Amino acid sequence: MTVDRAPRITDGDTRLSFGSNLSSFSEYLRVHAPEHLPQNRFADTGGVVMGGGDVAPHGTTIVAISYAGGVLLAGDRRATMGNLIASRDVQKVYVTDDYSAAGIAGTAGIAIELVRLFAVELEHYEKIEGVPLTFDGKANRLSSMVRGNLGAAMQGLAVVPLLVGYDLDAVDPSRAGRIVSYDVVGGRYEERAGYHAVGSGSLFAKSALKKLYSPGIDEDTALRFAVEALYDAADDDSATGGPDLTRGIYPTAVTITSAGAVELSTAKAAEIAREIVAARTATASPEGESAL
């Protein structure tokens, strides 16, 4: 009796009988074009530590806040290279699919490639399987991709993403916004405090959010808190850029609800930033003096 060898389904992934993972685009690259994976761009350095902070732009700071019915991710725009400002308008927050977004901290070039590859990974999975990954599945996929960058991280070119998303399988839709952080070796951690931050200014951003945040806040309040946290981080961390009213450069943000992921408009970001700067200026000005 002859048995046909057909693809089988294992743990939500389509695999051929010889073990090739059809639903993973990064696995496909690893087998057929490994030189295009972000972590393999530095495979020929002979193990020499490169001092990534001085040879490649680094991006910080990213904050995430969950609110009633959703979650948001926001980031500043500055990238630094050693003691220099490498860029003032870097995009650090990316929509990765309809219900998730990722922010990047660490070596900017590798981090941006990794997040873009992650977005392709999610799209590829949905095309092959016919259904999107669950939020836990997305978090696990990103974890394995960060782990794959360990070689570059050991050379000083670390990537630390922050993942947020709306969990369509959540029992309580008002608490469906989820935040997952990672370490440089790919460990994933669910952040249940309702907020989190990564990057060089994360200590100051989290300290600000600790005083501001309360469960059940609405989206507009969460957006204001995120920009305030980035403002406070920029006040104490030279690698974090605050709102630049002169150049018209403001933090970027993505909000995610049951309706999907939406990028914050520049006009809205400018409005929030100007309100915060005006309020801080008025508070700091001596009584009777003009804030201007």
From Swiss-Prot:
Its main location: cytoplasm. GO terms for molecular function: endopeptidase activity; threonine-type endopeptidase activity. Pathway: Protein degradation; proteasomal Pup-dependent pathway. Its EC number is 3.4.25.1. One of its GO terms (cellular component) is cytoplasm. It is found in: Cytoplasm. It comes from the Bacteria. GO terms for biological process: modification-dependent protein catabolic process; proteasomal protein catabolic process. Keywords: Autocatalytic cleavage, Cytoplasm, Hydrolase, Protease, Proteasome, Threonine protease, Zymogen. Pfam families: Proteasome. Transmembrane segments: none annotated. The active site is at residue 60. It catalyses: Cleavage of peptide bonds with very broad specificity. Residues 1-59 form a propeptide. The formation of the proteasomal ATPase ARC-20S proteasome complex, likely via the docking of the C-termini of ARC into the intersubunit pockets in the alpha-rings, may trigger opening of the gate for substrate entry. Interconversion between the open-gate and close-gate conformations leads to a dynamic regulation of the 20S proteasome proteolysis activity. Belongs to the peptidase T1B family. Component of the proteasome core, a large protease complex with broad specificity involved in protein degradation. The R.erythropolis proteasomes are able to cleave oligopeptides after Tyr, Phe and Leu, very poorly after Arg but not after Glu. Thus, displays chymotrypsin-like activity, low trypsin-like activity but no caspase-like activity. PANTHER family: ATP-DEPENDENT PROTEASE SUBUNIT HSLV (PTHR32194:SF0), METALLOPROTEASE TLDD (PTHR32194). The 20S proteasome core is composed of 14 alpha and 14 beta subunits that assemble into four stacked heptameric rings, resulting in a barrel-shaped structure. The two inner rings, each composed of seven catalytic beta subunits, are sandwiched by two outer rings, each composed of seven alpha subunits. All four combinations of alpha- and beta-subunits (beta2-alpha1, beta2-alpha2, beta1-alpha2 and beta1-alpha1) yield fully assembled and proteolytically active proteasomes. The catalytic chamber with the active sites is on the inside of the barrel. This is Proteasome subunit beta 2. It comes from Rhodococcus erythropolis (Arthrobacter picolinophilus).
